[in-house]
Amino acid sequence: MKKHFAKQIFAAALAISFVCGLSACREREEEQLTLKPVIYLYPEEETDVSVTLAYDGTLTCTYPNYKTGWHVSAKPDGTLTDEDGQTYNYLYWEGTDSAEYDLSHGFCVAGSDTAAFLENALRDLGLTRKEANEFIVYWLPQMQENPYNLIAFQSDCYTQVAQLDISPAPDTLLRVFMAWKPLEEKVDIPAQTLTAPAR
């Protein structure tokens, strides 16, 4: 059975900017394809922001074009404007990597309960309703029909695999990573405690 992973990058800056990303990865032989990672920027006032990604893998797609990094003007509502005057809702990238994730702790959730679980879990991890909605509408169709989903939030490993360098630097940084795979039967695993810093 293929392993399915959903990754969530999340970083918050109370004084300068707030950064949030949504992504996923799927194992293909020795590599995993990281799907739909996005980075949101929310400064307190309009700010020029540079974002670089040190990814322990190979980038396969970026939008806007990554080049040597992203350089945008970010507004408090999250609107990003690049050097060519184009506007975006977020920064997007995809890639392949061979990271290994631990699913020994987390949650076993019935497929039919996945939407409600994600609403609560993503709220507890500090996402806004808009950010959680973006995450859920992308992943729910792949999860809700499974008998069960094994879900584990793992920020430490993902922080090492996909390091973000943001300038100006955030005051607070929170990385959230959700790994998951479908199950035919329910399993008992130790539950995780989900917390988030103030934003």
Provide a role label for each language-model segment.
Residues C20-A24:
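C-terminal motif of bacterial Sec signal peptides marking the signal peptidase cleavage site
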